[in-house]
Amino acid sequence: MFTLFFRKTLTCWVFGFISFWSLTALAAEYSGPLFDAHLHYNTEAWNGQTGPHPVPDVLARMQRSGVKAIVSNSRPNDGTIALAQARAETAAASVTVVPFVRLYRNRSDYDTWFRDPTIYDMVLAELALGTPVGPYRGIGEFHLYDSANANGAVAKKLMALAEEKQLVVLAHVDDAAIDLLMAHTASKGQKLRLIWAHTGIGGAPVKRVEALMVKYPGLMGELSYRPGLTCDRGDLCPEWRELILKYPGRFLIGSDTWINQRWQTYEDIMRGYRIWLGGLPPAVAKKVAWDNGAALFGLN
């Protein structure tokens, strides 16, 4: 009788420990720094500091989320300048601003930038001016809703310019447009550094994503809004986990604060990343969360 009681007690203790360990493992989130590689500070968010999300508000959200650096690109570029000017505030929040020239002065530019010569002139003017934190480090985000527009005259000139000036490109495009854009550079995409916003928001298959990464060594995948990325409990789906483990130096995370609702849920967005990052080996998680972005822009 005592032996039976002892076995039952031991069994309960063992299963209890396993259950506790499992819950603890599930709850373990990545706790290190984050690099937000896709952030917008658009006019509706700040509106000359009278909008719902002035600089102190957005910096507080970044600080609460453990975000230590951002790629800032805004419509118009005044939003990025506002963040860059707030040097004391960003220093207090321990946030580094990496400024990009966005191609949009207003919403109508989304559909015409690739053929509008005034956009190219605007980019050149912004690059000449720079920002309070130094030169612009990249161009974008821009959108191509039809991949054929990657062959627009201005799109061609901007890709060549980006490679020539060693600027990083942030592009919201499909997989066909990646090939077209890369073809417009002198190196045919072998030297251009391009952040693929959403890593193909249209749902390019994982094998196609991998093929493009093999083809273009400077292609980085940013993972906001990526269809099929996460499965149960917010963990990575198996094929994406496998791809990230295979190419740990090629992925980035981002908030994509394109509307104010994304600012209102900023902490939740970043927590979602911490959940699935916690399921990766620690060194890989840190690469995706911070190291890759920091290395891309020389912040290490």
PLM-predicted stretches and their roles:
Residues 2, 7, 28-37, 45-76, ...:
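Mid-to-C-terminal alpha-helical segments outside catalytic/metal-binding sites
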Residues 9-22:
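Bacterial N-terminal signal peptides
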